[in-house]
Amino acid sequence: FSLEGGESLIPAIDFLINSAAEKGIEEFVMGMSHIGRLNTLVNIFGKSSRDIFGEFEGKDYEEDIFDGDVKYHLGWTSERISTSGKKINMNLAPNPSHLESVDPIVQGIARAKLENDFDNNTNKVLPIIVHGDAAIAGQGVVYEVIQMSRLKGYSTGAVSYTHLRAHETTSD
């Protein structure tokens, strides 16, 4: 599930994070499916290739307690420094194989951070959701979450939605 054909996602997210940090955002909560996820973990979240391959080899998790979903759907939390030197907290939410079920999770994590850590200051947390082609169908969880985000109890102030078109190559 490479990012082939959509490589511009990495510099786009990097630009978004650095620009938002300049405006005062301190926490980013991101949700995405499998396409480009490993690339994003390494290049945006700073997860080492060694950690990723360790998960694939099954050395980091006891099989009894692991939920059985694919390992590249696990979440990750990290801290990074923006291009201007600001500390940024980063969270990539775990994503189950039902691709867009992560959307309300991301919104909920962001809302909880706003309420518990930032006194509801919506200028401190930015949710980022990356969708694949199949998610933009005009109905379903994506649009439900967008509609809920307009309700007082669910609003996070803003959400960055990105549509990533899946490019698959085949040979004859």
At which residue positions do the language-model features occur?
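Glycine- and acidic
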Residues: 1-4, 26-27, 85-99, 123-132, ...
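Short acidic, glycine/serine/threonine-rich loops at helix termini
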Residues: 38-45, 136-143, 150
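Single conserved hydrophobic/aromatic residue that forms the stacking wall/gate
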Residues: 163-172
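N-terminal amphipathic, basic-rich helices that act as targeting or association modules
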Residues: 1-43, 50-51
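Active-site cores of enzymes that catalyze phosphoryl transfer or operate on phosphate-rich substrates
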Residues: 53-107, 111-115
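Phosphate/oxyanion-binding active-site loops and adjacent basic polyanion-contact surfaces
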Residues: 2-13, 94-106, 138
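Secondary-structure transition/capping motifs at alpha-helix termini
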Residues: 18-27, 47-55, 81-85, 112-123, ...
